[in-house]
A protein has these predicted regions:
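Alpha-helical transmembrane segments and their immediate juxtamembrane cytosolic regions
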Residues: 1-355
């Protein structure tokens, strides 16, 4: 969902820029954003690696997540800087950065009316990922990086060729929306419910299967076949079909739901709209990049504490989880401090930035 929304916003924002100021201006804006993401991606890696040197036992605690990466071994940093090795929980930004590099050309093609060609190309690239064609490149690269059979080579969590279909679907939708080529009120007509019911049926079909695979209820001989279709790293067919069903269903509820004659559907639409417009969630959304970087620090800190202490009770784990969630919004609160606390007694003047 977040990958699609990122593509949607990218398409909406930068297509307007291209239509107003030209391709090169829009391209430079997108690449500038990609460079900003790269700086954040490298900053969080360097911060964690610095903490690894000063915290007792951090090397052992984070070994499975960081591998052999160390500030004391500069050669281990080059694969990270080129995204060939991505430490655990630091693999989202590299994915976005790569997509942003190609985004200007994709947006421009959509503006020029070639959105269908873009969609077909994206689908073919996704199919290539499902068939493993990317291994023609990744397997030799992995062997070269490892240098030895027992050493770690290429380390990535997401198949870029598989997940791109979600991002660029968002790009297409966002660009066409900015060009006023799509009238969403007509696309999601409350009187046209066939696709909405189909989406619900598909989601309900996969729900028990998801529970069965998550809790080990699915027989091995079934899982052997089903698992090939449910590879998250490749955004396999199960994920693509589920995403399409849920995305369509949510969009129908949010756009067509408020106009539907059924009071229950209108109530569901109202509830979801209230949830998505909740001020706290909007606050987090405005500063999602900083929240992401901060959340990586929190996760590594919690994992370090867990590794350095005896077995924690369920109550303690719950308290740690609540505490981690409580501090998650700190970067957003700090960046919006003037807006939030400007008129607050005692702290209002302190929060204001000097002119």
């Amino acid at each position: 969902g977040f990958v699609f929304l990122s593509g949607l916003l990218t398409g909406m924002v930068y297509s307007r820029k291209m239509m107003k100021d030209g391709y090169s201006v829009g391209r430079d804006k997108i690449w500038s954003r990609a460079l900003e993401l790269y700086r954040y991606a490298m900053a969080i890696v360097l911060i964690i690696l610095a903490l690894q040197l000063v915290l007792p036992g951090a090397i052992a605690a984070w070994k499975n997540w960081l591998g052999d990466a160390s500030l004391l071994d500069p050669s281990s940093l080059a694969p990270i800087a080129t995204f060939l090795v991505q430490p655990t929980f630091m693999d989202i930004l590299p994915q976005y950065i790569v997509y942003m590099i190609f985004a200007p050309a994709v947006i421009w093609l959509c503006i020029r009316g070639h959105w269908l060609g873009v969609a077909i190309g994206s689908l073919l690239v996704w199919l290539a990922a499902q068939l493993g064609l990317h291994r023609i490149v990744t397997y030799p690269l992995d062997a070269w990086l490892a240098g030895a059979p027992d050493e770690e080579g290429l380390r990535v969590s997401f198949n870029l060729l598989g997940w791109q279909i979600v991002f660029f679907a968002g790009i297409i939708a966002g660009t066409l929306t900015s060009m006023k080529k799509i009238e969403w009120q007509k696309v999601f007509d409350p009187k046209r419910t066939t696709l909405a019911w189909t989406a619900l049926a598909v989601a309900l079909f996969f729900l028990p299967l998801r529970i069965a695979t998550a809790h080990g209820f699915m027989p091995g001989f079934v899982l052997e076949k089903f698992g090939l279709m449910e590879i998250r790293a490749d955004f396999g067919p199960v994920y693509l079909i589920n995403f399409a069903a849920v995305a369509y269903g949510m969009a129908w509820i949010l756009i067509a739901g408020p106009r539907h004659e059924n009071a229950v559907i209108r109530k569901i639409a109202s509830t979801l709209t209230s949830l998505f417009t909740f001020n706290f969630l909007q606050l987090l959304g405005r500063h999602s990049l900083q929240i992401y970087v901060w959340h990586v620090l929190i996760v590594y800190a919690v994992y370090y504490v867990d590794a350095r202490t005896p077995e924690l009770s369920q109550l303690t784990k719950t308290a740690i989880t609540i505490g981690a969630l409580a501090v998650l919004a700190l970067p957003a609160l700090w960046r919006d401090r003037e807006k939030i606390f400007a008129n607050a007694p005692y702290v209002g003047n302190w929060m204001k930035t000097p002119a």
